[in-house]
Structure formats: structure tokens, C-alpha cells
Amino acid sequence: MSQLNDISLVAQVVVFRNTKAFDQLVKKYQSPVRRFFLNLTCGDNDLSDDLAQDTFIKAYTNLASFKNLSNFSTWLYRIAYNVFYDYLRSRKETADLDTREVDTHWNTSQDDVGQQMDVYQALATLKEMERTCITLFYMEDQSIEKIADITGCPAGTVKSHLSRAKEKMAIYLKQNGYDGNN
């Protein structure tokens, strides 16, 4: 039913230029897209907000190209994925991303902040594609097939990235005091 509603909203925007319909799509997907960027940027709130805004601008301007060959969410994540990698290419920060300082401004308890910081630091040890796959699979609950569509990689490659990323994160977290029961 959700996909049908998304298609209806897309049609209203494309055919009637109904901006309120697009506002509904933004409200529905704003948090997941922002969370996706927060994980890819290892907690950089400002950058995540900027990238999310760019994603929705591109989605709006290209909405007529949505052909319903995949879910709207898959199409939107593909745009978000491209926005992020365009940003990396334009800023030539690919090498610097691994050393990015993690943003410490959180509205949660101290224990939650510490755990979130550790997760972001563990994510920072991953290659960009590994980080993308982990974020989409575990944090955005996307299937292997949808991740393959979003990234343009074969499903087997996505599985390999997930496996390597889990292994690297487990090593990092164990070295930093996590024993699997935390």
C-alpha cells in the first residue's frame, strides 16, 4: 500500500505540479535519507542536512524520470547515493573521510552518545562502499537486491562488502572494549 501511495504522490507532482504531494514524500523519507547520510558522513549533522536537501532537490527536478521500475524509496536512495559520491568527488575527500572527526552534538543520553560515537568511529574504518552497504542493510533495512539496485553492484558484491564490513567493525569494536554483549 505504501508503494501505491508513493506512486500516487509522484503522479500528482509530475502531472499537476502539486507541491503538497511532494511535501508528503519529503516528510515520509526525510528522516531515513538524513540517517543514511549521517552514517555515511560518520555523524556530520550539517553535511548530512545539506546532502539530504540536495537529494530532495534532485528528486523533485527529476521526478518525471521515475519509471516505477523499482520502489520509489530505491530510486530516492539511488539519488542519495549519487549525491554523496558526487560530493566526495567534488571535494576530493575520499582519503580524508576515514579521518573525519565524528560530530559530538547529540540529544541523547551519555551512554547512547558513547555507543553512537563508537559505531561512527567503526564506520569510519570502512571503505566507502562497505560503509554504504552496511548503512543500507543494517540501518535502513534495505534488502541485498535493493542495495544492488541502489549501488549498481551485483548482489554477490554487496554480500562481500557486507561480510568484510562486519568483520572490520567487529575487530574495531572488540579492540575498543565491546565483547558482543554490550
Give each language-model segment a name.
Residues D50-I57, S70-N82:
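Structural recognition of an alpha-helix C-terminal capping motif at a helix-to-coil junction
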Residues V26-N45, N62, L123, K168, ...:
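Amphipathic, Lys/Arg- and hydrophobic-enriched alpha-helical face
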Residues C133-F137:
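A short pre-motif secondary-structure segment
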Residues A64-N68, R78-D98:
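Arg/Lys-rich amphipathic alpha helix in sigma70-family domain 2
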Residues S2-Q3, G43, D149-G152, K166-N182:
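C-terminal edge and immediately downstream basic/flexible tail or linker adjoining helix-turn-helix-like DNA-binding
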Residues Q3-I7, D86, K92-A124, S143:
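Internal acidic/polar
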Residues M1-P32, Y178-N182:
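N-terminal module of bacterial RNA polymerase sigma factors
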Residues V15, T41-G43, D54-N71, R91:
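Sigma70-family region 2
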